[in-house]
Amino acid sequence: GWDCGPGNCMIDNFIQKNSDKKYQFDKDGQLAAKGDIDPYEIEIEKYLKSKLFQFKVPNSFSIENFNLEKFQKMLGKAPSADQAACLTEITVRSIYKSIENFCPTKKASVYLCGGGAENKFLVSRLKILLGSSFPIRNINTLGLKPKYIEAATFAWLAKKRLIGEKIYLKLSTGAKPSLLGEVNKN
């Protein structure tokens, strides 16, 4: 596994900023679904062709990698719904391009987790782009809670550290087997 784009971070930042933090995210993608990306196709593609998206896998991003203000300047005075739609489209296309470029098979299930798994508009766009070769499923179909995957991962990493078991991360981060973190025994 690897990071392929901004996920929800730019969408969430936009919604929080646009609503004076009244809302934390675009529930079900309702605002984005009202928007139009067609007038901004050039800006979306320009953003996706930036150096940021020219990576080799495995890859890891941080929220600091994605500059909402820079993208908003590219859009000019676009209506809020259009901005939300464009940000959602960047996330959707970054996932699509990562699968297209790096998935060794031409047919596989794609499991969504995190807040994006609950964003109906984002999921519908992914289904359209990926088609039937890559069916979209919510990770809850495997008995896992979408919002808790990252927390569960860090708990697992902590457990491995406490028992002194090295973790093999080469396929997901490129790192050599190692013990992560430090335990204060005081």
Role assignments for model-derived ranges:
Residues 97-107:
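Phosphate/pyrophosphate-binding loops at sites that engage ATP/ADP/AMP, CoA/4′-phosphopantetheine
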Residues 6-11, 87, 122, 147-150, ...:
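Catalytic-loop motifs flanking and including active-site residues across diverse enzymes
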Residues 89, 140-186:
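Glycine-rich phosphate-binding/hydrolytic loop that grips phosphoryl groups
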Residues 107-129:
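Glycine-rich phosphate-binding loops at beta-strand->alpha-helix junctions
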Residues 134-136:
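Generic structural signal for residues in well-ordered beta-strands
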Residues 1-92, 173-186:
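Conserved ATP-utilizing enzyme core subdomain
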Residues 11-14, 71, 95, 99, ...:
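Buried hydrophobic packing segments
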